[in-house]
């Protein structure tokens, strides 16, 4: 479904991604784990067209993606960035509708809005509330809901648990599981490696801009070096 081949990305003189290749198959949850500065967010930004890459290619259904974020959204790829980036001065409802700004199918947009409210009842309760007054957990729900409103096939989800209390982290990962049940495919970047690996089918480890390990989430979780580096265990 989504293939990244030998991606090379530079920030000025910094070689941020060094020949990264990954694959995401339809219906999967694939996670990228790694430390801060490893290049995880850079990878998602390159896939979604926000960063130009010097070499390599990104294929979606065997067709090379354009370096144009709006066109990529139209093709069925939604990027939910780190930090939520909601429209703080708009209402919850208007934030959600901003996610559908490239769509023309008004009836289906209304259906998707109601489906989003079903997935996030809290957003329905607060649909007229100004988004900037929501709690951190509610803002993360709003960011995910807005991403769903573009009617994507695949969702690129960057650090969804960042800054959330443990109980809300569990809620967010339960929501991710529910989204997969809706038939969506997810590429997940997440510093909470334990939670990410517990929900993913497959995983890649990204270190200093390079993929150093890949395999099933179960295999990665059992790797002693990964357990020590990312899961807080030396066993």
Residue ranges with predicted function:
Residues 1-235:
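Glycine-rich phosphate-binding loops of nucleotide-dependent enzymes
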């Amino acid at each position: 479904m989504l293939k990244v081949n030998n991606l090379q990305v530079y920030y000025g003189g910094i070689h941020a991604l060094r020949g990264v290749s990954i694959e995401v198959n339809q219906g999967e949850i694939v996670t990228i784990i790694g430390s801060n500065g490893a290049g995880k967010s850079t990878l998602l930004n390159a896939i979604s067209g926000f960063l130009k890459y010097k070499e390599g290619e990104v294929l979606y259904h065997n067709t090379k993606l354009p370096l144009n974020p709006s066109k990529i959204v139209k093709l069925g790829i939604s990027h939910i960035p780190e930090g939520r980036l909601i429209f703080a001065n708009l209402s919850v409802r208007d934030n959600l509708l901003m996610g559908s700004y490239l769509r023309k199918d008004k009836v289906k947009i209304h259906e998707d809005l109601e489906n989003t409210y079903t997935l996030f009842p809290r957003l329905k309760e607060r649909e007229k509330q100004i988004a900037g007054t929501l709690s951190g957990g509610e803002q993360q729900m709003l960011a995910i809901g807005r991403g769903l409103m573009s009617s994507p096939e695949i969702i690129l989800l960057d650090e969804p648990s960042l800054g959330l209390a443990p109980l809300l982290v569990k809620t967010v990962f339960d929501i991710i599981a529910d989204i997969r049940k809706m038939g969506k495919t997810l590429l997940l970047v997440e510093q909470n490696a334990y939670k990410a690996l517990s929900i993913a089918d497959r995983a890649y480890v990204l270190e200093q801009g390079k993929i150093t390990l890949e395999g099933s989430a179960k295999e990665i979780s059992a790797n002693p070096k990964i357990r020590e580096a990312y899961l807080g265990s030396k066993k």
